[in-house]
Amino acid sequence: MQKRTIPRRTFLKETLAGTTLLSLSSVLPSELLLADELSQVPKDLVFFSPKEYLIFEAVAERIIGQPSPGQPSTKEVGVASRADQFLAGADAEVQDQLHQLLTVFNSPIVAFLFDFRFSSFLNMSAEDKDSYIRDWMTSMFGVRRTGFQALKRISLSMFYTDSRSWKEIGYEGMFMPEDRK
């Protein structure tokens, strides 16, 4: 395996960007959520706060996209609820990083500083959400690209490990002997 060398300037810029993002996440003002949005959040959350649940649900919906007719949506599959259960068993350090990532991702301050947007992710239009996610995916800062990859992989794995989503991708499930189906 070849050792990857990073120029000092790149290392310093990425370290500074990552430190800034993580520092901001702990002091960002919390938005007030509407009562109807909160009423849709399950009461039995284990990992996510109600706000984080809404953020992750919105991210997963934009990453996975609209289903074909007759196929389940991210809400019907319960992607955010499944992620909540899955992440509850994750390592404490991973949990802390995901809480910070969701806070930073939804922050209007971070959106303004990096993308000149004046809104939190939850308050953006569908088109702006897609563009914002794309900005994270293609960012010059490795910490943002890594954050995007984390959100994408969790979203996709929670959606496509549910058997209701298999038909859309042409997967029929495991081949089992006829008597075990």
Regions found by a protein language model. Name each.
Residues 20-21, 28, 138:
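Residue-level marker of structural boundaries
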Residues 45-49, 68-73:
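Short, N-terminal intrinsically disordered low-complexity segments that are rich in Pro/Gly
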Residues 4-5, 26-61, 180:
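C-terminal segment of N-terminal export signals and the immediately downstream linker at the start
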Residues 1-22:
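N-terminal secretory signal peptides and thylakoid transit peptides that target proteins
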Residues 55-61, 70-181:
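Mature-region segments of soluble proteins
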Residues 25-26, 165:
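Short, polar/charged, Gly/Pro-enriched helix-capping and turn/loop motifs at alpha-helix termini
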Residues 18-22, 66, 158:
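Generic hydrophobic alpha-helical segments
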